[in-house]
Each structure stands twice: as C-alpha cells, then as structure tokens.
C-alpha cells in the first residue's frame, strides 16, 4: 500500500525507520517542528534544529527514496520565554526558501497560557506575511476544548489567513 507519513518526527528516529517506511510503501514524509523533550536554551539551538530539518533530514530520507518535507516553528511547549520566542521567530524566514518547507507548524497551545497565545499570534502573523500554510497543534495539558477554541479564534481573527490553508 502506498501512503504519505503526515506527521513523522524523524529527527528522533534511525535510518532503519526510513528503510522500514520505504519498504512498507511510504512515498513521502512530513515532519513538523516539535519539542525535543527538553527546552532549547538559545536561538542557536533552534538554528541548528532548523538546519537539521531543512538540510540533513532530506538527505537521510533520500537515501531510501523518500522525499522529506517539514514545518517550522517554536513549539508551544517552548513559548513561555517570550524573548527566546521572538529570536526564534526572527530566524524562521531564513529557512522558508528551503524546497522542503511546507509552512509554519506545528503551532498552537499547550497550557493555554498568555505567553503561548502571544507566540501563537506571532506565528500566525509570520505565516500571513509570508503566505505560508499553517499546521495546528492542540493542547495536551490544559482544557483541550478551550485551547482549541482559542486557536481557532486567533486564526479566524486574522483576515489575511485563508482557513483552507490551515490544517
């Protein structure tokens, strides 16, 4: 059976996983930026991560005949530090021209905090400024329904965003 992996965090996987996916019929991989299990402490850490997503992972996937696509963002779990978030949002445009970048994501909320909401709004603004697709992340920790409503409201309230370009 042929399929596309819509949400694979391949930076944390081995090449054996790429091989198994290819043998199982995978035709392409889409990898959203995600939390690494710990908070990155600097913009340089994110720069290196974005290089991994836009340069290294496409080469690893290509060894098994798989196109690799990615989404870029600062994950909601790392959005509490507004200074760091601003710095990270500032470098994302450098990577948008990479041929494997699909858009901004996975963005959203985790604890539904004010800082997360502010960074979500900044992500949506960045996507609008650069006409990028948006991939949404719904909350894990707090009220999922409330968080999802907040996310939808942010997207709906930005008239530059076409809802058909949001996943």
Spans of features found by a protein language model:
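Mid-domain alpha/beta scaffold segments of enzyme catalytic cores
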Residues: 1-167
């Amino acid at each position: 059976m042929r399929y596309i992996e819509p949400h694979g965090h391949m930076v944390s996987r081995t090449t054996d996983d790429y091989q198994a996916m290819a043998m199982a019929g995978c035709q392409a991989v889409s990898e959203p930026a995600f939390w690494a299990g710990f908070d990155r402490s600097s913009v340089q850490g994110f720069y290196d991560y974005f290089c991994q997503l836009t340069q290294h992972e496409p080469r690893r996937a290509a060894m098994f005949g798989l196109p690799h696509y990615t989404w870029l963002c600062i994950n909601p779990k790392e959005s509490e530090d507004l200074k760091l978030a601003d710095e990270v949002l500032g470098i994302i445009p450098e990577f948008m021209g990479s041929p494997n970048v699909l858009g901004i994501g996975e963005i959203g909320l985790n604890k539904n905090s004010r800082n997360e909401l502010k960074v979500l709004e900044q992500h949506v603004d960045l996507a609008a400024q650069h006409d990028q697709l948006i991939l949404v992340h719904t909350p894990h920790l707090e009220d999922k329904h409330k968080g999802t409503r907040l996310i939808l409201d942010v997207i709906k309230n930005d008239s530059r965003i076409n809802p058909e370009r949001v996943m």
